[in-house]
Amino acid sequence: MESVRHRIALLFANEADIQDVETVEDGVIVFPNSNITIQDRWTYAIDYELDSIRRISWRNPSSTRQFSVIESRLAPGFNIYSNDKEARLNLFGIQPVYSPMYKSLHSETWKSINEILPGGKNLNIPWNPELCDYDILITANTVQVFSYCSLVEKKKFVKDAGKVEIGLFHVDTEDEEDINLSGLRCTWEDTSNNIGKCEKTTLFYKPFHLYVDDSSDIAPITIENTNGLHPKMKIDLSGIRKDKDCRHFVFSQLPSEIFVDKFQSPGSIVFGLDDLELPDYKVNSLSWGSESIVTLKEGQINEITYFSRYLEPKERASNKTVGFEPILFKACQVGKEEDLSNPFYSRSLGYEAYFSENTKFYHINSTSVHVNIPYPNKNDIGNIEYTTFGIVVLAICYLIYKLLRPSRKLSTVKRD
């Protein structure tokens, strides 16, 4: 890496909490008096072309951290995206899912970033996947790393390699069009490790990710037949009116054990593993699963039907629990003249890529759902095989009998 610049932004719950920040000679000390989101942004300038990877994101699937106005809505898990159609993307020993917009790899567990980047480049970032989310955007000669964490204990921010400034913000005003952040911006001196004067600052921007309050009550998500091979997810939009500039969608990354039945789920698009016949133990080495995006209808309850794959038999009857987190959102078109760029996050590959640049995303609900898939009992396999074999033999014998049996001729009796 040739050079790095490091900026920090802290989002406080209110203006009063910023007053509790202590400014010392070499930095600032912040106390976790309320819910505080920390965004670290590292920008690396490099002098060579990177390969096909264009975005890497991580959000802990078990995280309960709430999204804030300074961050993008990341898909859960560890995700790698590429839009290079020529290059291969077969990390983790599995094949990617291909869609018209990108190819992707997904894992529920954290992977080493330094091992994924070309040449094993070390970014010298203190990764903390348990508590933080990450969004890494890669262009030809630049790597940008966005980190989002919650402040859980008192922390002192001091200068390190490339660190230039820290912003302390709170939401002054917010609506569906604009967000106004007010606060302080402090910079470190170039010639020393001391922090300079902190100045008042204000930021106006138009977000393209917005989060609806009390969302679980607006559009509840439920799952039915959770112990069968054909579970159904119901999304209740009966209380939502149709808008000519907006449509509702649900995006899901599904493990190999389950996939959307696109024939029974109108408006669904599925990429990846969707073979109806193959059991899970035949496909889980081929790819990680599938992606689906379903167009929903406002004013009614929407049903999405899934197929569960047959699992490898076990000695005793049991179930395997698999889960996923559908992302329910409303996508709205805005005027092309409206600038949706902002200093905190950028649009990139992922579900955002299915929509135009002038799209706003209103996130309504993201409820984790689970289904139980039964394991076949190994002890029953013999009986099933013998029964199936017997039925097949009887069917063949019956067909042979029908084919070889002498045909009856119809006779007529002439009456006098």
UniProtKB/Swiss-Prot annotation:
GO biological process per UniProt: ERAD pathway; GPI anchor biosynthetic process; protein processing
Family annotation (Pfam families): PIG-X
Lumenal membrane side: 1-381
Transmembrane segment boundaries: 382-404
Subcellular location: Endoplasmic reticulum membrane
Topology versus the membrane: Single-pass type III membrane protein
Domain of life: Eukaryota
Keyword Membrane annotated: yes
UniProtKB keywords: Endoplasmic reticulum, Glycoprotein, GPI-anchor biosynthesis, Membrane, Transmembrane, Transmembrane helix
Cytoplasmic side: 405-416
Function, in words: Required for proper folding and/or the stability of a subset of proteins in the endoplasmic reticulum. Component of glycosylphosphatidylinositol-mannosyltransferase 1 which transfers the first of the 4 mannoses in the GPI-anchor precursors during GPI-anchor biosynthesis. Probably acts by stabilizing the mannosyltransferase GPI14.
Recorded family membership: Belongs to the PIGX family.
Descriptive protein name: Protein PBN1
Organism of derivation: Candida glabrata (strain ATCC 2001 / BCRC 20586 / JCM 3761 / NBRC 0622 / NRRL Y-65 / CBS 138) (Yeast)
Gene designation per UniProt: PBN1
